[in-house]
């Protein structure tokens, strides 16, 4: 640091008194210049630090290890594109999720004579999504039934997705699909969309928990295609999302005591057969034989000692809707008998959810176990 020269009392004053102020002025200028240079150096260090951080984030970028579709290689400099890792498609949980969603769509659209076989190939143009939403929402959309050109397809898809987003009422950052991604047959976007629809409309299906998909992010840098992989979560805890997250004794049995679970199942089978045998009916599989609601309705009549008129329910239901109506009717009979409203949804029983079925039957057992 520059300092001013000390004055000696025995030395006469300098004949050039302006020199010291000039030196001070120079020192001041150098100080300011030094400060400016220091600030610039600090700013450069910050910039380098930020760049280092960005490089750390992008460190996983590496040459692509699998063959890309020719369309996916047509990228502009620094353009980014995402796609599903081909190896990830074989994941059993992902395969299960896609099958559950395909079966659900086909069941909803059975009256439309539409059969979906591949989610990306069959949903990208908006036709199936239109019919699915119209059926779920009971609302006719003002869109063209058939579209051939890409422009017409995207216009239709835009209208359909706007209606879906309005119904779901999701915050913008939670919407993980758009016209371009769906029309580009982006499986991740389509899965996010279908999962959101199934949960909002409380579809009678059980989605597998914690399904993730390996996504490859491709970017063009200095003329070279590079990629990195990320895990994209499609479903989390589906029970918590559907409001069925309160754990009870059956959660514990399923998770930690499968041997005791079998004892409970045998006890309940003995209980229901004790009464259903009076009608020459017998149960061997709890989750499947109560799924259409018929045995539940008949069982309630036997336990309460009355005859349920056959016109009050569907004796041979042939659709999900009729099965749900049967189970809902049985739930009403249970409440009429003094039981609380069952915690499971009728759709859970129809979907052969064993845990839900056991909860309902166990409530009946605790109230009616001494009934002959």
From Swiss-Prot:
Protein name: Alpha-parvin
Topology of the protein relative to the lipid bilayer: Peripheral membrane protein
Protein role: Plays a role in sarcomere organization and in smooth muscle cell contraction. Required for normal development of the embryonic cardiovascular system, and for normal septation of the heart outflow tract. Plays a role in sprouting angiogenesis and is required for normal adhesion of vascular smooth muscle cells to endothelial cells during blood vessel development. Plays a role in the reorganization of the actin cytoskeleton, formation of lamellipodia and ciliogenesis. Plays a role in the establishment of cell polarity, cell adhesion, cell spreading, and directed cell migration.
Tissue expression from the record: Widely expressed.
A GO molecular function held by the record: protein kinase inhibitor activity
Sequence similarity: Belongs to the parvin family.
Region (Interaction with ARHGAP31): 21-25
Phosphoserine carried by residues: 8, 14, 19, 28, 62
Subunit structure: Component of the heterotrimeric IPP (ILK-PINCH-PARVIN) complex composed of ILK, LIMS1/PINCH and PARVA; the complex binds to F-actin via the C-terminal tail of LIMS1 and the N-terminal region of PARVA, promoting F-actin filament bundling. Interacts with TGFB1I1. Interacts with ARHGAP31. Interacts with the actin cytoskeleton. Interacts (via C-terminus) with TESK1 (via C-terminus); the interaction inhibits TESK1 kinase activity. Interacts with PXN/PAXILLIN (via LD motif 4).
Domain of life: Eukaryota
